[in-house]
């Protein structure tokens, strides 16, 4: 969504924030009496992307501030996109006024990516400098055929594989299905 917004308008101000970072920003700003600066920062967005909004449940002060930021962005016709692991109406300890606001927008349930897409995601993410694993297409397909839920689980499998490879001092270019089975034994059931 952020890339598309920049293509449409290269001058767009796009802010992405994982919810727990937002909560930390709010908590710190309240402690240092700089809440207005933080609100102005988020209100300056043309597009605000918030990951894991469900984690705001039970965080009363963060909900209060998010409500005001949301209203400002909505009233100025800015866009807000957030991810959530459930429909907003099902989030316990979420203020009703936020449930109402969240339900006014377009709510989509995203299906897990198909096998080929999961393999492509694994290949792309394995090239990230923090992971830096040399996966063959066959190995990526093998992992993707066993890790079917979501991108986070794919990333988790890659991180677990990297830790195993590093700990076992296996050459990063020699990652085979057997190595994957050793690393991801709880996810990968070897064929008998």
Per-region residue spans from a language model:
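Conserved AAA+ ATPase "sensor/coupling" helix adjacent to the nucleotide-binding pocket
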Residues: 86, 97, 105, 117-132, ...
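C-terminal helical "lid" of AAA+/P-loop NTPase domains
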Residues: 123-127, 138-146, 152-167, 182
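Short regulatory helix/loop adjacent to the ATP-binding pocket of P-loop NTPases
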Residues: 27-31, 86-104
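Conserved alpha/beta core segments of nucleic-acid transaction machinery
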Residues: 163-192
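Walker A/P-loop
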Residues: 1-15
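Structural recognition of the conserved hydrophobic beta-strand(s) that form the central parallel beta-sheet
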Residues: 16-17, 49-51, 79-85
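Conserved alpha-helical scaffold flanking the Walker A/P-loop in AAA+ ATPase domains
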Residues: 8, 25-50, 56, 60-72, ...
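Conserved AAA+ ATPase "SRH/arginine-finger" region at the nucleotide-binding site
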Residues: 74, 90-92, 105-117
